[in-house]
């Protein structure tokens, strides 16, 4: 829907040398998405790079989330390095299954919490986005 509405859609691509996520614009998913890092679908290297400063919202994966927006990632640190460089106005949204919601996830001072956590059962956590 976002592409059909003329929105710029960017997906992450792993840069193995820097261990960072590059944000790449996709226009035609059938053509622009290829097997990438560890066989995961990601934008082709030829796709245009998108500046982190232009991001309005980001969908963040994880193993578990808590009801305060805490997130337990997969251990690679890719989103831990991406989230701090996004503009503060960018909404951080986690999509998860209800089984991934726990009482509390371990956290460190550098961890960035999610603004919204959504499951198949509905919104689990949301904070106002006035930034």
Predicted regions located by residue number:
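N-terminal active-site beta-alpha-beta segment that forms phosphate/nucleotide-binding
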Residues: 1-54
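Surface-exposed, charge/polar-rich loops and edge strands
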Residues: 29, 44-49, 53-58, 66-70, ...
């Amino acid at each position: 829907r976002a592409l059909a509405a003329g929105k710029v859609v960017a997906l992450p691509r792993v840069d193995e040398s820097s261990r960072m996520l590059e944000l790449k614009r996709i226009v035609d998913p059938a053509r622009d998405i290829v097997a990438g890092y560890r066989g995961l679908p990601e934008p082709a290297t030829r796709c245009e790079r998108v500046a982190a400063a232009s991001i309005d919202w980001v969908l963040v994966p994880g193993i578990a989330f808590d009801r305060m927006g805490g997130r337990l990632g997969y251990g690679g640190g890719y989103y831990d390095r991406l989230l701090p460089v996004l503009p503060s106005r960018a909404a951080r949204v986690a999509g998860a299954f209800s089984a991934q919601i726990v009482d509390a996830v371990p956290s460190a001072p550098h961890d960035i919490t999610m603004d919204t956590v959504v499951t198949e059962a509905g919104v689990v956590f949301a904070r106002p986005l006035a930034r």
